Amino acid sequence: MPVLRSIRERFAAQRPLDGTTVAACLHVTAETANLVRALMAGGAEVALCAANPLSTQDETAAALVEAFGASVHARRGEDADAYAAHVVACAKRRPHVTLDDGADLVSLLHAGGPRSRARLIGATEETTTGLLRVRGLEAEGRLTCPVIAVNEAHAERIFNDHYGTGQSTLDGILRATNLLLAGQTFVVLGYGWTGRGV
């Protein structure tokens, strides 16, 4: 992740996020760990919980805590009660910014009283489902900060949908079937951004 590494180095020198609290409800993976490290290098206090307990990499969560001093509330396979408690733990940090995958964190902050979201100045949401929840808050007149719809960004379609999903799809097929691709015939249903990546 050379771009993120470059940002982390610049952030470490400039510290643009000093005094900023970031709460993230994302997949706890090595990729997310690099994002957390970049934010922390920039001076942010970061609290991370899992957007999906089944994707949590326990070794990554442990490394973030032990090697980098991050606040991580996640465990692979945690039950619904533990998941909810971990989202609450991040919300209790009274973040300035949230990074969400499913809108659990930003929704919880808006369900609480004004004090719970008093410092909230912005958020990001990665998923279509999460954006439906955010737009519901907006329609009710309850959304108190701008939310960046990551999933609707042109760069998301180009890089993640096209290249990332294409790569992940082929990788998943290869791992699940143990087939050699040479000489195989594939049928790709749909030929949008994602289908072209496959």
Residue ranges and their predicted role:
Residues L26-G43, E156, N160, G164-V198:
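Glycine-rich phosphate/diphosphate-binding loop of Rossmann-like nucleotide-binding domains
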Residues M1-L17, L48-Q184:
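Glycine/serine-rich phosphate-binding loop and adjoining beta1-alpha1 elements at the start
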